[in-house]
Swiss-Prot record:
Stretches with biased composition (Low complexity): 583-594
Amino acid composition bias (Acidic residues), ranges on this chain: 15-28
Use in biotech settings: Possible candidate for an effective malaria vaccine as determined by epitope response in sera.
Protein known as: Uncharacterized protein PF3D7_1223600
Coiled-coil segments: 36-60, 317-359, 1188-1239
Spans traversing the lipid bilayer: 1271-1291, 1314-1334
Length: 1560
């Protein structure tokens, strides 16, 4: 990598030398100003000259619509101290100029220089950074808005003695930056400051890889320069460009006549009393118009920006004047830009937008002409923004469209996929997230050459606001579309409201109506605000933050009331309420969402269950099961309640305003009565806000005022978090008072302390009452920390903090006090979702969500197997699988001579051509993407913790090591699995049964080593002989529940779970009474399997035989790693912690490739092996006793399974009994604790029930998958690949496979801790790939093989036994013969060649022969065929998987470089390491993939190096790659340039884990 980087850098230096004059001509004066010396006064420049110069530079940029990059820049690190206030430029020779940009990233600052243009760079920790344009900021400090319109008294030059002094002031003045996630996918977008540079670089740009779609974000600064910057973060390139300059827009409005609403405080009071109830008094807004420059406001005050929680997208389709709302069904996306800016010549600027569900549409390449204007898709998108300056609020609309008649001169095509953007905007509210983290897109643009546009709508001027008062927080509600005011003129009405909070406690509520006429062509906006509400809090305090929580009375009643209600009536009202809450969805789409299956019972979003039939499993994945299982919190079908009471209650809307002051929190509860639509229409003449049901607040009643009354002035609140989805709820209080905890409030104080409050709702005499109480301290003392998205708290760690832990066990991070990382809780919740995700280290919340994710993945398999019309889809964007996927496989043509062409038919899967991907990443940002990173973050924290191990003395440590100590890379492996199962069956007896081909000699039996084949036999045997026992272990619970065999599984187990009879380990078929119909199905499936050419031993590794045992093991290991046996290896460094801990340690740079693994002591390793391979047999001393015991256990198995099934908590009849039994068990608390302690399990009752629920769902899903009616080979391939992908994801989340890239280069590749589960999944992948990829026309004839053997192979007998390897060598030989002459000319040692074996000799310098794509595909057929053959002989050669190696010549030293089937790297004799492609088994070197041959060890104990020359080729076959793909989830390198991959998989997703592939 260093060579590549240096090569690029040298070329770049030469280029920069040629163009240095052009680059630096416009910045000479500024370079002088930034010279780091004490002669600043002599080099000072006049302010007016700078201003004129800046204007001239802007004029030279052709027009204002040209976006400007800072550049594509390489970082250089500078020394910093804690607090980010110190800079040291002594080690650099750079000077600051207008092209430089300073970026602060956590504890590091990066200075970018234009001279390093297009060089690769590393950008660490982008989650929190400040973006400062140094020259702009400096010029701003000089000018301070000094222009004709805005006068400023301070017109002095700012002087700095050094650059450091300037940066001090810049950093102190800077605020955090708003960062938004991807808006649109960008391909090869580069803009340059200089036209000459662009012309000379255009040829180089064409070869730059495509930027990954996840790397596009928008950046908004809170600096006084008011910039909205676009930011594209790639692996190699960081792009900054200007999207919107708020300051320029603001100055453009100075001469406009704008609407000014004067807010004058009403002296008569804020309230009015009607019938004894207190209401907020409606106030009058005084409206006037005036020039903005005449408005008296203070520009020197700090300003801030607030945005609406959603954006609106409107669309007008071809030849249709009607505006269509954007629905949520995701379709394809496409946008192709064929025109570029005048300053960029011939640069490829294709922008392909890919939606969040991996949909890629066909390209539309027609060019736009003005006469085609009526045929294009017009779109209009906008968001509301408020700029707060002292006592003025400037209300802006920021919008974007593709209307070419409004001044945009660039070409435009069909706007990409509106539904996708609309879906993104609905999911997030950027104002509710920390400002230093990634945000959702608030703005989006169709074409990056189009600026966002801004329009000042009005100004709110607060007349009576005191000089010391100012706005501290503003909340803008969601923008909602109401109706057409005038359909002929396209006059549309949108409504929203604004809540403001001032420092002195004045709260204002404004109701705004936005009218937009002819939005696609004219963009005419009109804002109307007629009335507002306000009230005053205690002026003695200062108030900081304002947050809103809204509930309906119907929802509150469903939580608090204990009685039951009619489900059908409830369902109807609930659907109507949900449709009203989301205005952006059309009626037809909502009908599909809620009524896709009229015959099935619906599980509502308000904790309501309507049934448990078979269709229920499709509907019950995404509701709050925790609330559902609580007493009195569920509604059962066919039970009645007073309908009038429900109707009366649901007429109210409750709003809870949470206000935080210096030391206290205040909650104000408001209630408004909903008006009917007819009444709203009548009132529309008098008040514009009456049309908005959710905004209109006439008759707003104040119900309650609560305060925390904290008297401790030292507890200053720095932040508050509202957790609306609380896991821990006191059921006893609810049963007595019909009360319920609405939400939990967590106050974080500056001194590091935390205080929790709960806001309770109770129902008394038909009315709701609300209380704010202090939450009692929990026994676990868990800490809630809201860090939204996938940036964990791990990132602020550095060497200094970690070193401090040696003397102190406490760390203070983000004002959160942690101890040993044991009680860290990460809470992530999403708006309008019933259930939040609470992740912890030391209790069950984490394992529950882990199992929940498996349930969701299994549900996706069912959605692909069944017709979307037959199931009720929970996510509406998954509603139509055909629309989502059919274009992916429209052109899939399977060759006629394919071995499976007679079985796979087009449109076989219910007319849905589905690719072999589960779309795990691109759905909802909270479903899988962040979940993965959250798990990694917590796992890393836990790995660094020496749980209860550091406190032991030396003697106890030795005892602890011998008994319980497990190395971190052994705890996940199959060895620990054997430690689990040997508790239930005798290990020696297993070996005796499994190794049937070995004599019964005890001495020989002890020498048997575990291999992959024996491992498969063991887990088969364990699965068929494991029985229920009264053990309260997690593994026991999961296994027995998933293993329950009901009537649905008879056919499945009979067909697919046949085990080799030689081992006497077949299933007990006594209970599988199969009828005649099922027998016919069995015969049909057997014929299909024979015709499909499933090779001999595929049934041995079939993943569907091991799904139960895999699920159980993975769940258990996850629970095991996080709860019971904390990993005590402090030397293990994960992929995250490596960059945080070891960056200054030079000794790791050469010794390790990425991360080192702990060295294992030989004594310790031998002890572990002895413990594994030797197990005392107490219960099973002989074969007879063992068989008798096994028969007795099998006879009792079904009874125990039935009992467990009856006791499942989802059973409606036994739920109350279980709850009562739980209460009884509480009385015997001491006995329960003793029993739990004996089994190392301490579980909370509610979380245990919830965990059981998801395990139950997994069982239901697997039953449906296994009993799918379509027993065709295609369906089997789909199911098996999907299951492999699920298990592969789980394995990587757990890091069970320790064969990743974090390896020690001195580590023996054969001694790597092979996880046989990992190998089992990989072999399933490769076997299934072989079935898909096999094509007989590429297979070489046997005659060619024989000829090759006679000519080139000395040991003919041995090699002739493996014809597939000979076919591969013959393939190499044919290519060699075609390129032989060229190789001989270039070979310096050609005189030493052996004429007999031209290609089988060791050359002093390796040579590479390039091949094309057809040869690569032939190679894939051959290499997969060899792997298939090796799997077929696993019974005859039990160690074949350990003996199989891939080999090439090292590209550096020409030594032999090898890898095995399960490692993802190559290593040579000189410890040179190269990446390996897990799909083609090739070695990735630079921009090529080197194709290996197969090498088999004769004996597993033989030395790997050196390899005899007879097995070494003198050259490598290489294939040039356009791009190299890297999966950031499973750390595998994937090369996808072959037709096979394009046929059966999504091109930009990893086939193993479905994660999006990044381009290196």
């Amino acid at each position: 990598m260093e060579e590549i980087e240096n090569a690029h850098y040298q070329n770049l230096e030469n280029f920069n030398d040629e163009t240095s004059e052009d680059v630096n001509d416009t910045s000479d004066d500024i370079n002088k100003n930034n010279d780091d010396n004490n002669k600043y006064d002599d080099n000072n420049v006049n302010v007016l000259d700078d201003k004129n110069k800046l204007e001239n530079e802007e004029d030279n940029n052709n027009n204002d619509n040209m976006m400007i990059f800072s550049s594509i820049l390489r970082y250089q690190r500078y020394k910093t101290k804690k607090g980010n206030i110190y800079f040291d430029f002594k080690n650099t020779n750079l000077s600051l100029n207008e092209k430089d940009m300073l970026v602060q990233s956590s504890n590091f600052y990066h200075l970018f220089d234009i001279k390093s243009l297009l060089c690769p760079h590393i950008y660490l920790n982008v989650s929190s950074h400040i973006n400062i344009n140094i020259s702009d900021y400096k010029n701003y400090l000089k000018r301070i808005l000094n222009n004709d319109n805005v006068l400023d008294d301070k017109n002095e030059n700012v002087k700095y003695s050094s650059c450091q002094e300037f940066i001090f002031e810049a950093v102190e003045q800077a605020e955090h930056i708003e960062v938004f996630t991807k808006v649109q996918i960008v391909k090869k977008l580069f803009l340059f400051l200089n036209q000459n540079v662009a012309e000379k670089m255009k040829n180089y740009i064409d070869n730059i890889p495509i930027i990954n779609s996840n790397d596009y974000v928008l950046v908004q600064t809170n600096l006084k320069n008011d910039l909205l910057l676009g930011y594209v973060k790639g692996i190699k390139y960081n792009l900054f460009f200007e999207i919107l300059n708020m300051k320029k827009c603001f100055h453009s409005f100075l001469n406009e006549n704008i609407v000014i609403y004067e807010i004058n405080e009403d002296k008569e009071g804020y309230f009015k009393t009607i019938d004894g109830k207190k209401y907020l008094k409606e106030q009058i807004v005084y409206e006037k118009k005036d020039l903005l420059k005449n408005l008296d406001f203070y520009s020197m005050y700090y300003c801030d920006y607030y945005f609406s929680s959603n954006s609106i997208i409107e669309l007008e389709k071809k030849n249709n004047n009607n505006i269509n709302c954007v629905n949520n069904n995701i379709n394809s996306v496409n946008n192709n830009i064929n025109s570029v800016d005048n300053n960029i010549n011939n640069v490829d600027n294709n922008i392909n937008s890919v939606n969040n569900n991996n949909n890629i549409s066909d390209k539309i390449t027609h060019k736009f002409e003005y006469n085609d204007y009526n045929d294009i898709h017009l779109f209009f998108s906008f968001n509301i923004c408020i700029k707060s300056v002292k006592n003025n609020l400037f209300l802006h609309i920021i919008y974007n469209d593709n209307n070419l008649k409004n001044g945009d001169e660039y070409l435009n095509e069909t706007f990409p996929h509106y539904e996708e953007l609309n879906l993104y905007n609905k999911q997030f509210d950027i104002n509710k997230m920390d400002k230093n983290l990634f945000k959702s897109n608030t703005f989006f643009i169709n074409n990056l050459y189009y600026h966002l546009k801004c329009k000042l709508l009005c100004v709110f001027k607060f007349i009576n606001m005191s000089d010391d008062d100012f706005m501290t927080d503003i909340h803008i509600s969601q923008i909602k579309k109401r109706r057409y005011v005038n359909e002929q003129d396209s006059y549309m009405l949108y409504t929203f409201n604004i809540h403001t909070l001032s420092n002195e406690g004045m709260v204002y509520i404004f109701f705004c109506n936005l009218y937009i006429s002819n939005m696609f062509k004219e963009n005419n906006f009109e804002i109307r605000v007629h009335t507002y509400l306000h009230f005053q809090l205690n002026k003695q305090n200062s108030y900081k933050k304002l947050k809103l929580i809204k509930y309906s009375s119907k929802f509150l009643y469903s939580l608090c009331f204990k009685e039951k209600s009619d489900s059908k009536k409830k369902k109807k009202k609930n659907d109507h309420h949900e449709r009203d809450s989301d205005n952006n969805n059309n009626d037809s789409n909502n009908n599909n969402y809620y009524n896709s299956n009229n015959n099935s019972n619906y599980c509502g979003s308000n904790n309501i269950i309507y049934g448990h039939d078979e269709n229920f499993i499709f509907n019950s994945c995404d509701f709050n099961t925790l609330d559902q299982i609580k007493s009195g919190n569920y509604l059962i079908k066919d039970e009645t309640i007073n309908e009038n009471f429900i109707f009366e209650v649901r007429n109210y809307k409750y709003t809870f305003i949470l206000i935080s002051s210096k030391c206290n929190i205040i909650i104000i509860t408001l209630r408004k009565k909903k008006r009917k639509e007819e009444y709203n229409k009548k009132m529309s003449k008098y008040s514009s806000c009456s049309l908005n049901e959710n905004v209109y607040m006439e008759g707003v009643e104040i119900l309650n005022y609560c305060s925390s009354n904290n008297k401790n002035t030292n507890n200053i609140i720095c932040n508050t978090i509202i957790n609306k989805y609380n896991y821990e709820i006191n059921n006893n209080i609810k049963n007595k008072n019909k009360s319920y905890i609405l939400f939990e409030i967590v106050c974080f104080y500056e001194n590091g302390e935390i205080q929790k409050y709960i806001y309770t709702c109770s129902l008394k005499n038909g009315n709701f009452e609300f209380f704010l109480n202090v939450k009692e301290d929990e026994k676990t003392k868990s800490i809630n920390c809201k860090k939204c998205f996938f940036k964990p708290i791990l990132f602020p760690f550095n060497e200094e903090l970690l070193n401090k832990t040696k003397s102190s066990n406490d760390l203070v991070l983000y004002n959160i006090k942690l101890s040993h990382f044991k009680n860290l809780i990460y809470i992530y919740f999403q708006e309008k979702k019933i259930e939040g995700i609470s992740l912890t280290i030391n209790n069950e919340c984490l394992i529950i969500n882990y199992i929940k994710m498996v349930s969701k993945l299994l549900k996706k398999i069912l959605q692909n197997l069944y017709n979307s019309d037959d199931i009720d889809i929970v996510y509406n964007f998954q509603h139509n699988t055909k629309n989502k996927c059919n274009y992916l496989s429209q052109n899939v043509n399977i060759p006629s001579d394919n071995t499976i062409s007679n079985v796979i038919k087009k449109n076989e899967m219910d007319n849905n051509d589905i690719k072999y991907n589960l779309f795990t990443q691109r759905e909802v940002k909270s479903s899988f993407f962040e979940f993965k990173y959250i798990l990694f973050g917590f796992y890393d924290l836990f790995l660094m913790n020496q749980k209860n191990y550091t406190d032991l003395n030396e003697k106890k440590k030795e005892e602890y090591k011998k008994k319980n100590f497990i190395n971190c890379f052994d705890s996940h492996s199959h060895y620990n699995f054997l430690n689990i199962i040997k508790e239930y069956i005798n290990y020696d007896y297993i070996i005796d049964k499994c190794s049937y081909n070995i004599s019964n000699d005890t001495q020989k039996k002890k020498k048997i080593k575990l291999n992959f084949y024996y491992f498969l036999l063991i887990i088969q045997y364990f699965k068929n002989t494991y029985t229920q026992e009264k053990k309260r272990s997690f593994f026991y619970m999961v296994y027995n529940e998933l293993l329950q065999r009901d009537k649905y599984l008879k056919h499945f187990y009979y067909t697919y779970h046949e085990i080799d009879r030689k081992t006497n380990m077949h299933l007990n078929h006594n209970d599988n009474n199969i009828d005649t119909k099922e027998a016919k199905k069995n015969e049909e499936t057997e014929l299909i399997l024979k015709n499909v050419n499933f090779y001999d031993n595929y049934e041995l590794i079939n993943i569907r035989k091991y799904d139960v045992i895999l699920f159980c093991f993975l769940f258990h290991m996850y629970n095991f790693c996080l709860k019971q046996n904390g990993l005590s290896n402090d030397e293990f460094n994960s992929h995250i912690t490596y960059f945080l801990i070891n960056k200054k340690m030079k000794k790791y740079k050469k010794k390790y490739r990425y991360i080192s693994k702990k060295k294992i002591d030989t004594n310790e390793k031998n002890d572990d092996n002895n413990n594994i391979n030797v197990c005392d047999s107490k219960n099973y001393k002989g074969t007879k006793n063992f068989d008798d015991t096994t028969n007795n256990i099998l006879n009792k198995q079904n009874e125990s399974l039935d009992n467990l099934k009856k006791n499942m908590y989802l059973s409606k009849n036994n739920y109350d009994n279980q709850l009562s039994s739980y209460k009884n068990t509480k009385q015997n608390k001491t006995n329960i604790n003793e029993k739990y302690n004996n089994n190392n399990i301490i579980m909370n009752y509610l979380t245990w029930k919830k965990c059981l629920y998801y395990i139950y769902k997994i069982k239901k899903y697997t039953r449906k998958i296994e009993t799918h009616e379509g027993l065709y080979i295609s369906s089997m391939l789909y199911i098996n690949i999907y299951l492999c992908q699920i298990f592969f994801i789980l394995l990587n989340i757990l890091r069970i496979n320790n064969t990743n890239i974090y390896t020690n280069i001195h580590f023996d590749i054969r001694k790597n801790n092979l996880d046989y589960f990992y190998l089992l999944i990989l072999l399933n992948f490769y076997s299934l790939f072989y079935i898909l990829i096999s094509d007989q026309k590429y297979i070489l004839h046997e005659e060619e093989n024989d000829t090759y053997i006679s000519k080139n192979i000395d040991n003919k007998e041995q090699m002739a036994n493996d014809k597939n390897i000979i076919s591969l060598l013959s393939f190499f030989n044919n290519i060699y013969e075609q390129n032989k002459e060229g190789m001989l000319k270039n070979d310096q040692n050609k005189n030493n060649h052996n004429t007999k074996t031209d290609i089988l000799y060791m050359s002093s310098s390796g040579m590479n022969i390039s091949i094309n794509t057809p040869f690569l595909e032939k190679y894939l057929i051959l290499i997969y065929n060899i792997i298939k053959d090796k799997i077929n002989i696993v019974k005859e050669d039990n160690y074949i998987m350990e003996k199989l190696f891939f080999k090439i010549n090292c590209m550096i030293c020409n030594k032999v470089c090898v890898t095995n089937i399960y490692n993802n790297y190559y290593i040579c004799e000189n410890n040179h390491i190269f990446n390996k492609c897990m799909l083609t088994f090739g070695c990735i070197y630079k921009n090529h993939i080197i194709l290996p041959t197969i090498y088999l060890l004769h004996d597993i104990n033989d030395k790997l190096f050196p390899i005899n020359n007879d097995h070494i080729l003198s050259y490598n076959l290489q294939y040039e790659l356009d791009y190299i793909y890297f999966c950031s989830f499973c750390y595998n390198f994937i090369t996808t340039q072959n037709s096979f991959y394009k046929k059966f998989f999504l091109f930009n997703q990893c086939p193993f884990c479905n994660h999006e592939l990044n381009i290196l």
